[in-house]
Amino acid sequence: MSLEKTTRMNYLFDFYQSLLTSKQKSYMSLYYLDDFSLGEIAEEYEVSRQAVYDNIKRTEAMLEQYEEKLLLLKKFQERKEMFNKLKELASGSKEEEEITALIEALEKLD
């Protein structure tokens, strides 16, 4: 599994986990956050490895569908990029400290 996919799934899970069932949350958390193998999760829940795999794949697809509709990750990434550009523009300005403080305050709200 690629690092990009893992990172994306972690972000999607953070944004949309409240929309998942407790079993989906648990499987995704164990697989992506705790780095459990499919076999370890299957053993923990006394189900087949295939059942865990199917559940994780369905949940990944659901998370992608939520993102297609709600765009929380996309908007988060765009805001992050804008903050970085603002910081670049602020450096060297005579009001740099004040601008930087405002940017940091905005980031804390996010």
UniProtKB/Swiss-Prot annotation:
Pfam families noted in UniProt: UPF0122
Cross-referenced InterPro entries: RNA_pol_sigma_r3/r4-like (IPR013324), UPF0122 (IPR007394), UPF0122_fam_protein (IPR054831), WH-like_DNA-bd_sf (IPR036388)
Entry-linked SUPFAM superfamilies: Sigma3 and sigma4 domains of RNA polymerase sigma factors (SSF88659)
Family: Belongs to the UPF0122 family.
Function of the molecule: Might take part in the signal recognition particle (SRP) pathway. This is inferred from the conservation of its genetic proximity to ftsY/ffh. May be a regulatory protein.
Name of the protein in question: UPF0122 protein YlxM
Gene: ylxM
